[in-house]
Amino acid sequence: ARLLARNGYKKMTVDDLAREVGIGKGSIYLHFSSKEEIALSHIDRLVDRVKERLRSIAERDAPLEKRLHDMLIERVMIRFDNVQHYSKSLNEILGYLRPQLLERRKRYFGEEAKILAMVIAEAQASGLFAKGDALDLAQTLIVATNSLLPYSLSAIELGDREEVTDRTHKTANLLIDGLRVR
């Protein structure tokens, strides 16, 4: 991540990465076929952390609305916080990885939606949320909060954590209000 921040994606080489972590270039190629694969692996690990955190919140002993609210906030803010050190090169990285990333995003978001759907279904069963397809509703929440993810923000917005946090809270509140039984 430091190397990305310093050199940008285009200028970063596998040689640079090997030097940075103190191993031979060959050792890197034992695990990864290219720097693209290394970057995608980094993104995969970030999404794994997001899903772990969502599961942890889903299992908490807290009101259902609070759990869902916190899950929506976390899925945005974990990503925001993780790209801060290379936010200037984020567009460059995404430009190079776009085709591969688009394939993975569908899977990432589908997996996150399944976790959200568990809480939505529980809230529906308790009479708190209106009936409906919990997974479809979860996918709608994912799509609605995706506009707050780092790749959707401008460089200026990426620098303002307070603004992104505030906007994410407002969005989560609005979305959850739309799920309530009337």
Positions of the model-derived regions?
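Phosphate/oxyanion-binding loops and surfaces in catalytic or ligand/nucleic-acid-binding neighborhoods
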Residues: 49, 71-82, 126, 144-151, ...
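Hydrophobic/aromatic-rich alpha-helical bundle segments in the mid-to-C-terminal region
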Residues: 87-91, 102, 124-171, 182
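Helix-turn-helix
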Residues: 3-37, 41, 45
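Short coil/turn segments at alpha/beta junctions that flank glycine-rich nucleotide-binding fingerprints
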Residues: 6-10, 61, 82, 126
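Amphipathic, non-transmembrane alpha-helical scaffold segments
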Residues: 39, 43, 47, 98, ...
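Short secondary-structure transition hinges
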Residues: 70, 74-115, 135-136
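Hydrophobic alpha-helical connector segments
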Residues: 41, 45, 55-82, 137-141, ...
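C-terminal alpha-helix
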Residues: 119, 174-178
